[in-house]
UniProtKB/Swiss-Prot annotation:
Lineage, opening ranks: Eukaryota, Fungi, Dikarya, Ascomycota, Saccharomycotina
Membrane-spanning residues: none
Protein name: Pre-mRNA-splicing factor CWC22
Gene behind the chain: CWC22
Record field: compositional bias (Low complexity): 749-766, 781-793, 855-873, 885-929
One cellular-component annotation, GO: cytoplasm
The species this protein was found in: Yarrowia lipolytica (strain CLIB 122 / E 150) (Yeast)
Length: 954
């Protein structure tokens, strides 16, 4: 055992012994008091049983007062004896009559009995206490140890060092310290007392490891306490300081704690709701996820309260939501949904909650959506005239009408001292009453974060961005004040120039454009009828847009067109945000298109813009946008010219574009019908605009368009393309063949002169390698065909026959002639080899001599078979004489893209007909077609050289 373990055991034994001593001291004191009470009882009993007092035990009413006085006197004597101590108590009770002969003897007997009973009780109690200590030694040791620790700390013992020693030295093992802390926290949560000093000591040890779960738990508890403290301290006077201080804590991690603290504080103090709403708006402007979570939880809280008929819960929830709408944290659509739910089936409680809701948000609703506000008050007037509510509720409605008449003087939208958020920093959440979401209760509790340090660093950067602006502004203000004291006049001039330049820059930036978009969005979303939306949008496009003074007319016109374009873009954006397509948007677009040509141009540009970026939207948004434009096209409000931007090909389209077109054409078919839609698309002035969707020139594009429209159940629209598709396919095949033939001719003519290098006689020795082609026995299978009987080997006797047929052979050919009609695959061969030189200067194929190699096997009947091996592809002959097997069969093997001209080799059973030297060069080029072999022109050795086309030979 180590020294530390021995020291730990000794300290534990000392603590146990000290615990036993204290327990014995307490037991002895308790037994001493019991013995004194026993002594008093025994003393009175002995005196009552004495012979002199035996007669007093009989009942006598006259003696009862004396008995009471005697008891009272005895009790006084016992109290005096307890005050005087044990030493005088042994001599007998004070005030006893020593002259009585029974007194000393009775006192001695009582003393003996007292001592015996005391000893017996002490021994019995010691045994019981020992057993109890053995059974519960762990819990008693912990409790007594904690008490000793607290006593030592209070007496002035150094708490840090002493406490660490007495808590079993958890620094040696952090895991043991964590387990000990866990046990203590469980005891504390179960109602047991745990010294805070002991918990702090363990926590201090665990703080050293920042990746541990205990450290994160401690930090989470500290975060909860800090947020709760700041929320409880906030007021209208210190909200600026509290808002800056609350950002120093990690609100992303503690957003659930913040929402819970704010909701709890607001429900307990409804008059402070504007303060909590302002604090939430400040946090929401920098961290929108916090504001969204709070809105969701308030909606869920209202739902639960409404289902359970809890008026207080509903009242606190709608009050908070009303002020959040005033600060643009929640949208006014949520206000209208709540009022519709409360006034749909009016009761006393629902009307009371609705009245309180309208008091807080009535001014905001009248400013943003006056039509909806009027509808709400009309509903309240109808409820009031029904007279089914209590008098108290009716009086509340009448009071609300009076408040509205006074212009909500006591219920402003935002109080002046709480107007701390700029309009540009508003972040509005489109959360509806019927949306499906959760309150994320897990955020209220601790969850270990594996990336704790990384997330903390990220929030530190975010905190610097949020709080750094205010620090910079304060520094700038202080510097400006110092400079103002020194140079007031110069700085005044600079400020004027800066303001002038700033105003000019602000007019040309997107700040006003963003404000315009917000106004358009709020106008469209809060208006109930088409006429009202059109009127407000036209008014916004004319009055709200301010053109900077001094701007040239052309630039002012461009700026105005750009900003009016935003009206149409925002109308389509609002339509895309809807969960289900609303026909109000289609009617609004139709009305705007019929106002002027400017609106038509704007919508045409809008269609092209949204079609080009449609892949950025979700499927539901694509559906709404496509339905909107489909309705405009079907109603002839939007020009068909917009379809010029559509190119329906596999290369130019993507899945989002195809989905958009499918939904748009489906909407047009629903509005017009298939027959009328087909008639519209077949009109001449429309055909020029839909050429990209219904192509008529490219067969592959036509085929793709036909397949697409057939797949979306719009096959009748492709009847015209189906008619022209076969002609396009034939035309493409014909053009393809012509291109291939032209390419072959071009390649052959370009490589025609490349064979002049064969003038050297010795260069033909390399062609001896063609003898190896005898190994191609696979071609022997052709000998079984009867069609080859008419062909003989190349000899003197069959030249006339070849001349009559008009077929010349100017190439080196390899011919094999079997000994019989069908010969076996393996047979002996005998060959005679000869080489002959032929020169042809006239270029006529049948008359010239040729250089050949003939292999004679036997003089019997043979088949003439010529194999020509070339290094380039051979063109097909165009003449009829080259078709089929009208000439001898030749197999052509292409090795490369080299010219078609080559030297041929012939094998024959008959002797060679050619004369001349056995080894001589030949300049006769040869074109070898694939199947039907046709003679090719020969190039002479002497000038003039003449090029002969293949077509001239047939």
């Amino acid at each position: 055992m180590s020294d530390k373990e021995r020291e730990r055991e000794r300290s534990q034994s000392r603590e146990r012994s000290r615990t036993r001593e204290r327990s014995r001291t307490r037991d002895s004191k308790r037994d001493h008091s019991d013995s004194r009470s026993l002594r008093r009882r025994s003393y009175r009993g002995d005196r009552s049983r004495s012979p002199s007092r035996s007669r007093s035990r009989s009942y006598s009413p006259s003696r009862s007062p004396r008995r009471k006085r005697r008891r009272h006197r005895t009790s006084r004597r016992s109290r005096r004896s307890r005050r005087e101590g044990d030493g005088r108590r042994k001599d007998g009770p004070r005030g006893h009559d020593d002259r009585s002969p029974l007194a000393p003897r009775e006192v001695e007997d009582v003393t003996v009995k007292r001592e015996d009973s005391t000893n017996d009780k002490e021994s019995t109690h010691d045994k019981e206490s020992t057993n109890d200590k053995e059974r519960n030694v762990s819990m008693e040791d912990r409790k007594d140890t904690s008490e000793d620790v607290v006593e030592d700390v209070e007496e002035g013992d150094p708490s840090e060092e002493a406490l660490e020693k007495k808590v079993k030295n958890p620094e040696d093992d952090l895991e043991a310290a964590a387990e000990e802390l866990k046990k203590l926290m469980e005891l504390k949560s179960g109602g047991r007392y745990v010294p805070p000093a002991k918990i702090r000591a363990l926590q201090k040890l665990l703080v050293q490891d920042k990746t541990s779960k205990e450290f994160q738990k401690i930090q989470f508890d500290n975060l909860k306490k800090a947020i709760n403290s700041l929320v409880n301290k906030v007021s209208a006077q210190n909200i600026r300081d509290i808002a800056g201080e609350i950002f120093t804590h990690n609100l992303i991690r503690g957003r659930g704690l913040f929402c819970r603290s704010v909701m709890t504080a607001q429900s307990l103090a409804l008059p402070y709701t504007p303060v909590y709403a302002c604090l939430t708006a400040i946090v929401n402007s920098k961290l929108p996820q916090v504001g969204e979570l709070l809105v969701r939880r308030l909606i869920l809280q209202f739902r639960r309260g409404y289902k359970r008929n809890q008026k207080d819960v509903c009242l606190s929830s709608v009050t908070f939501l009303a002020h959040l709408c005033n600060y643009h944290v929640a949208h006014e659509v949520l206000v209208l949904q709540l009022l519709h739910l409360l006034l749909e089936t009016p009761t006393d409680h629902s009307v009371e909650v609705a009245v309180a809701f309208i008091k807080e948000s009535g001014a905001f609703l009248a400013e943003v959506s006056p039509a909806a506000n009027n509808g709400v008050f009309e509903r309240l007037r109808a409820v009031l005239h029904d007279g089914e509510l209590e008098k108290r509720t009716q009086y509340m409605i009448e009071t609300l009408f009076q408040i509205r008449k006074d212009g909500y003087e006591n219920y402003p939208v935002v109080q002046e001292e709480l107007d701390l958020v700029d309009e540009e920093d508003y972040v509005t959440h489109m959360t509806g009453l019927d949306d499906k979401f959760t309150d994320d209760k897990l955020l209220n509790y601790f969850v270990m974060d594996p990336d704790y340090e990384a997330n903390e660093e990220k929030y530190d950067l975010l905190k610097k961005e949020i709080l750094g602006d205010s620090d910079d502004e304060e520094e700038d203000d202080s510097e400006a004040e110092e400079e103002a004291d020194d140079e007031e006049e110069e700085e005044g001039d600079e400020e004027e120039e800066a303001q002038a330049s700033t105003s000019a820059v602000r007019d040309l930036t997107g700040t006003e454009l963003a404000t315009l978009r917000k106004k358009i969005y709020l106008t469209v979303m809060s208006t109930m009828s088409i006429d009202e939306i059109v009127h407000k949008l036209v008014k916004l496009s004319r009055t709200v847009i301010e053109i900077p003074e001094g701007l040239p007319e052309d630039q002012a016109l461009i700026l105005r067109l750009k900003r009016t374009q935003e009206v149409t873009n925002m109308l389509v954006e609002c339509c895309a945000q809807e969960k289900i397509y609303n026909k109000i948007y289609g009617g609004t677009g139709e009305r705007l298109l019929r106002l002027s040509r400017e609106w038509r141009t704007n919508f045409e540009n809008t269609f092209g813009f949204f079609y080009s970026v449609i892949h950025r939207y979700e499927p539901n948004q694509i559906r709404n946008i496509a339905t909107f434009f489909g309705y405009l096209l079907a109603s002839d409000s939007l020009s068909w010219k917009v379809l010029e931007a559509v190119s329906l090909t596999e290369e130019d389209s993507n899945p989002s574009n195809r989905i958009f077109l499918k939904i748009m054409f489906t909407e047009m078919r629903q509005e017009l019908g298939m027959d009328l839609l087909k008639e519209r698309l077949s009109k001449p002035f429309v055909q020029q605009y839909i050429a990209g969707m219904f192509p008529k020139t490219n067969a592959s594009h036509v085929r793709f368009a036909i397949n697409y429209f057939t797949a979306i159940n719009l096959g009748p629209l492709t009847d015209g393309m189906r008619e022209i598709l076969p002609g396009l396919v034939e035309e493409e095949e014909r053009l393809k063949k012509e291109e291939e033939e032209q390419k072959r001719e071009y390649d052959s003519y370009d490589s025609y002169d490349s064979y002049d290098s064969y003038d050297s006689y010795d260069s033909y020795d390399s062609y001896d390698s063609y003898d190896s082609y005898d190994s191609y026995d696979s071609y022997d299978s052709y000998d079984s065909y009867d069609s080859y009987d008419s062909y003989d080997s190349v000899s003197e006797d069959d030249r006339g026959r070849r001349r009559r047929r008009g077929v010349g052979s100017r190439r080196r050919s390899l011919t094999r002639s079997p000994g019989s009609r069908s010969r076996p695959r393996s047979r002996p061969r005998s060959r005679s080899r000869s080489r002959s030189l032929s020169r042809d200067r006239t270029g006529s194929p049948p008359r010239g001599r040729r250089r050949s190699r003939s292999y004679s096997r036997s003089p019997s009947r043979s088949y003439s078979r010529s194999r020509s091996y070339s290094r380039s592809p051979s063109p097909r002959p165009k003449s009829k004489g080259a078709k089929g097997r009208s000439s001898y069969r030749a197999a052509s093997y292409s090795r490369s893209r080299s010219p078609v001209r080559r030297v041929g080799y012939s094998r024959s059973r008959s002797p060679s007909v050619s004369g001349g030297s056995s080894r001589s060069p030949s300049r006769s080029p040869c074109r070898s077609p694939n199947k039907g072999r046709a003679p090719t022109p020969e190039k002479g050795l002497s000038p003039p050289r003449k090029r002969v086309r293949a077509s001239d030979l047939f």
